[in-house]
């Protein structure tokens, strides 16, 4: 399964580990993905989303129905 947030679309990004001697080696910054179940009152069912902690805060702020509506408008299947 891809390490991609279903709500925000955040993906792993690349960068460097930098030592004290300023040597650089490649590394990946992974998104803080969480798997959560949400109750959709309008459809009377549970949905499971794989989202980042930032997206979880968006769900808390805007509500799951609004977030799911935005996802469906983008063409994502929920």
UniProtKB/Swiss-Prot annotation:
Location of the region described as Disordered in the Swiss-Prot/TrEMBL record: 1-26
One BP term from GO: translation
InterPro entries cross-referenced by the UniProt entry: Ribosomal_bL28 (IPR026569), Ribosomal_bL28/bL31-like_sf (IPR034704), Ribosomal_bL28_bact-type (IPR001383), Ribosomal_bL28_sf (IPR037147)
Keywords, ordered alphabetically: Ribonucleoprotein, Ribosomal protein
Pfam families: Ribosomal_L28
Disulfide bonds: none
GO cellular component, one term: cytosolic large ribosomal subunit
One Gene Ontology MF term: structural constituent of ribosome
Family designation: Belongs to the bacterial ribosomal protein bL28 family.
Database matches in HAMAP family: Ribosomal_bL28
Name of the protein described by the UniProt record: Large ribosomal subunit protein bL28
Organism: Nitrosomonas europaea (strain ATCC 19718 / CIP 103999 / KCTC 2705 / NBRC 14298)
């Amino acid at each position: 399964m891809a390490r991609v947030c279903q709500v925000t679309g955040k993906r792993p990004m690349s960068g460097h580990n930098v030592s004290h001697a300023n040597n650089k080696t490649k590394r990946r910054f992974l998104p803080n993905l969480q798997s959560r179940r949400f109750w959709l009152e309008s459809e009377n069912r549970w949905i499971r989303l794989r989202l980042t902690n930032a997206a979880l805060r968006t769900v808390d702020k805007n509500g799951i129905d609004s977030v799911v509506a935005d996802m469906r408008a983008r063409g994502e299947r929920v």
